[in-house]
Amino acid sequence: MGFLFRPKELPRPASLTFTLDQAGHTYDDGHVGLAPTDITISELRVAVIGLNGAGKSTLLGLLDGSLKANAGTVTIAGGEERLDPAVKKDAKRIDNLVGKVRREEIPNSYYKADSIREAIDEPLKKHKVPESERQAIIGNLFAHFDLAAVARESASALDSEKRHLLAIASALSFSPAAIVADEPTKGLDEVASAHVAKALFSYDKQVVFATHDTELITRAEYAIDRTLVVDDHQVVFDGGPHEAVAFYTDLIRAKYEAAKA
């Protein structure tokens, strides 16, 4: 299901190409989040797997512009645009082009709104989106993400599955070209996880996401094009989802055996 809101200033590309050219990030405390990495991502469905602390979130932060590379460069391209997150003007445009999802996190303002419909409507209103378009946007999102029945509920009244769905709907409310999602099904049981994944991957948007759910990425209906395995702050495998899961399983087994030795 596609989407209709488009800013008038610049055309919205159908998808993006993310390029890391020896790009890495070291945090202020000296901890290496991601070693210098060369990678280009243009596929529509890309998964990132790895153990806790391996560097997945840092990689996603470089892709969505929430982290700046302090080694190498990051370029985000779409249509005729080539954007550098380190450039202030480009960073603002990237915020518009890349929707960010962090588990079930939603803006704090959502908890202050009387309803989740109002919570999504208010930012659109502030950006002077006409009422007819706002209603179409919200109706589209709430129908697709199964939120219509709880539209008048407050964010705090939602269960975990609905909050995950709302987090994705929120990221899509300004119709970005791509979604970068850090563990969009974290903490959910098998049924709820499948519901959220189906809604996310059936929406007509490019998705780059991190997960620990290796079964999810190998399910044919989600059509994952490519999977990266991150370990020890670097990408150690880049290929198809089934091959990536086999590699990852062997990697974990080797770490376990080494720990026993």
Predicted regions and their residues:
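Helix-to-loop junction immediately C-terminal to a conserved catalytic motif
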Residues: 64
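ABC ATPase NBD coupling module
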Residues: 81-101, 126
